[in-house]
């Protein structure tokens, strides 16, 4: 908890002395604001209480992507540590992944089938945290003004956002996100940077627009933009109260979805590289499969004793 920061006026300052973590802005570190939420604080303290009883620590991550941090943890912590990610439902993605397995998938997958390749921006900001209504309106109007095709998972605000966003895309209450991200028409992913969404975007080789809200999402955004270089930030001051305006959003989306842009081409190239790293990790004899087998072997030894 000592790394939680109060960063008013100093958010762009950087620190480079945290073991295993490359230079990072203060604003991207965990905030003390998180600890004011009693439910979150209880979960954090509960997790800390388990450390002394723990024999194994499994990370839903890929060693090659966070090797420096993992190596530091292995050196500092007494338990065995294994990276076994990405732990998502299925790995063989491709054109067959758009096959409909649920009647509720029909409308949005049929719509995606009719869109040009890499032309649709997929938007999802998670279900746990939310942005203000004012910011949501700015995003919707900016999206409309960008004239970019989109698919937005908005849950409780579907009807209202449909009216604001115009007719360039779909607003739906739910979707099978992995199916959508692996669809050939998807060219970008506006994400809150939850860890599962981040991994799914990487595995599907989709460039990311990062819009973190709280908890670990700022650090995930930093990894996406600065370390892995597979995405762009929507909001520079992630803890500031000022809105990202509709004009800023429209310009950014239009630029991000321009497949002829050199910056976009480079981001897409990096996304392809990260996808290959993910695929190698979960392939036979890859790092994640090797770690899973090693963990099972260790458990078997314990049972034998």
Label for each model-derived stretch:
Residues 197, 208-210, 214-215:
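Short glycine/proline-centered loop/turn elements that form peptide/ligand docking sites
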Residues 169-170, 184-197, 206:
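Acidic donor-binding loop of glycosyltransferase active sites
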Residues 1-179, 188, 204, 213-215, ...:
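Nucleotide-sugar-dependent glycosyltransferase catalytic domains
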């Amino acid at each position: 908890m000592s790394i939680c920061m109060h960063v008013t006026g100093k958010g762009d300052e950087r620190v480079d002395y945290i073991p295993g973590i490359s230079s990072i802005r203060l604003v991207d570190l965990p905030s003390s604001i998180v600890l004011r939420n009693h439910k979150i604080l209880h979960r954090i303290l509960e997790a800390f209480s388990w450390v002394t009883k723990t024999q194994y620590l499994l990370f839903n991550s890929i060693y090659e992507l966070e090797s420096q941090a993992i190596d530091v943890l292995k050196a500092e912590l007494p338990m065995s540590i294994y990276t076994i990610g990405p732990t998502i439902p299925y790995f063989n993605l491709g054109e067959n992944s758009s096959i409909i397995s649920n009647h509720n998938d029909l409308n949005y997958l049929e719509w995606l089938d009719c869109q040009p390749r890499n032309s649709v921006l997929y938007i999802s900001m998670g279900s746990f945290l939310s942005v203000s209504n004012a910011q949501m309106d700015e995003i919707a109007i900016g999206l409309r003004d960008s004239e970019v095709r989109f698919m937005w998972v908005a849950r409780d605000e579907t009807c209202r956002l449909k009216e604001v966003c115009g007719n360039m895309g779909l607003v739906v209450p739910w979707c099978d996100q992995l199916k959508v991200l692996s669809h050939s028409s998807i060219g970008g992913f506006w994400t809150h940077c939850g860890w599962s969404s981040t991994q799914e975007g990487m595995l599907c080789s989709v460039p990311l627009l990062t819009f973190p809200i709280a908890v670990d999402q700022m650090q995930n955004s930093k990894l996406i933009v600065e370390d892995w270089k597979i995405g762009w930030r929507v909001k520079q001051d992630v803890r500031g109260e000022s809105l990202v305006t509709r004009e800023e959003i429209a310009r950014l989306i239009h630029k991000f979805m321009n497949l002829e842009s050199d910056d976009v081409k480079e981001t897409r190239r990096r996304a392809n590289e990260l996808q290959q790293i993910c695929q190698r990790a979960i392939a036979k004899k890859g790092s994640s499969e090797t770690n899973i087998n090693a963990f099972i072997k260790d458990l078997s030894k314990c049972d034998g004793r």
